[in-house]
């Protein structure tokens, strides 16, 4: 049996929209040009009005390709544009915090790609900047606003799998290009920072609390030094989350959520297809090989469109952004603890930071 699930109401009640939020984009990164910008341009609350690159020709090329009215040859010029309300920051990881801070100080709201920082300390600096400037700053985990994940959490919180006991995930791709930023340690490359952050944030999302301790095992590339294969165990007491992520493994992703009474499988957990329904499989275990599973289809939606509109909604309605900095800080605390654990060979506790008011 296949059941169709309609879009989950992410934000509050609809309100009249006086005008769309005007977005500027820092850089011409592939994810921005190929995925995020085209998706945001379809949104009801967002419009892209400017794009910048350190090379004006590249900015103009992207602007022409994507029908963006303004192109700038420096990030500073875009930040100085009074017609820009908010910034999308898809720059390399080591540039996330510096340019997000500059944008905030220029009075722009900021949606910054994950991981939003390279450390807990950097994330805390962003929190201090946000509090001082009173702009909205959030981390771009697009999965957190997609209806399939909101439905999955509803099932778990509603007892659909019984008591939640285990969340297990795999996320991998193959890339050994030494010039690719994902393979450069100095700019925040490696498997955990690029894709391991997803099973971490979604495990926290499903359990609804923070892990008390974590342990990680890392295999590093002998030439590039990045973590090319990482496996981890997060202790949510009661309950565990495990994941394996790799930058040098066959492309694959999966998510299994197991409880005392059922199992929930998410067909495509992270790169959710925008052009076909995504599926959840809820299995009571009465038959092996998943033959007893019920299928729920979430109608096709682009997670980047939803992400942009929900952030724009937060600006328009002065609400909370989908993934606030306090959440980003806690995710980074887990990442740091896993790196420490890989070095010590022991369990490590994620370290809360004073700037995290929710710790």
PLM region descriptions:
Residues 46-50, 85-87, 189-190:
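Short active-site oxyanion
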Residues 32, 72, 89, 111-112, ...:
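Hydrophobic residues in well-ordered beta-strands that form the structural core
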Residues 125-142, 162-166:
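Rossmann-fold dehydrogenase core element
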């Amino acid at each position: 049996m296949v059941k169709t699930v309609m879009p989950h109401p992410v934000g509050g009640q609809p309100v009249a929209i006086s005008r769309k939020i005007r977005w500027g984009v820092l850089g011409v990164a592939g994810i921005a040009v190929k995925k995020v910008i085209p998706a945001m341009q379809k949104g009801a609350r967002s419009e892209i009005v400017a794009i910048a690159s350190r090379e004006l020709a590249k900015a103009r090329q992207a602007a022409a390709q994507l029908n963006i009215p303004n192109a700038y040859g420096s990030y500073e010029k875009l930040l100085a544009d009074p017609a820009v309300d908010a910034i999308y920051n898809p720059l390399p990881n080591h540039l996330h915090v510096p340019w997000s801070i500059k944008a905030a100080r220029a009075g722009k709201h900021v949606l910054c790609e994950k991981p939003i920082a390279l450390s807990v300390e950097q994330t805390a600096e962003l929190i201090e900047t946000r509090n001082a400037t009173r702009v909205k700053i959030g981390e771009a985990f697009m999965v957190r606003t997609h209806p399939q994940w909101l439905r999955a959490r509803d099932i778990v919180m509603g007892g659909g799998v019984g008591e939640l006991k285990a969340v297990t995930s795999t996320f991998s791709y193959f890339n050994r290009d030494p010039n690719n930023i994902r393979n450069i340690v100095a700019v925040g490359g490696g498997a955990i920072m690029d894709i391991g952050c997803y099973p971490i944030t979604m495990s926290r999302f499903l359990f609804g609390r923070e892990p008390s301790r974590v342990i990680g095992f890392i295999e590093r590339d002998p030439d590039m030094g990045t973590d090319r294969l990482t496996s981890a165990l997060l202790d949510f007491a009661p309950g565990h989350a495990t994941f394996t992520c790799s930058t040098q493994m066959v492309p694959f992703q999966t998510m299994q959520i197991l409880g005392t009474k059922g199992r929930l499988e998410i067909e495509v957990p992270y790169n959710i297809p925008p052009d076909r329904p995504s599926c959840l499989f809820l299995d009571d275990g009465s038959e092996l090989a998943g033959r007893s599973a019920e299928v729920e289809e979430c109608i096709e939606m682009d997670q980047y469109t939803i992400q942009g509109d929900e952030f724009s909604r937060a600006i328009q309605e002065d609400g909370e952004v989908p993934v606030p900095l306090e959440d980003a800080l806690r995710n980074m605390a887990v990442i740091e603890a896993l790196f420490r654990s890989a070095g010590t060979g022991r369990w490590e506790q994620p370290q809360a930071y004073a700037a995290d008011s929710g710790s």
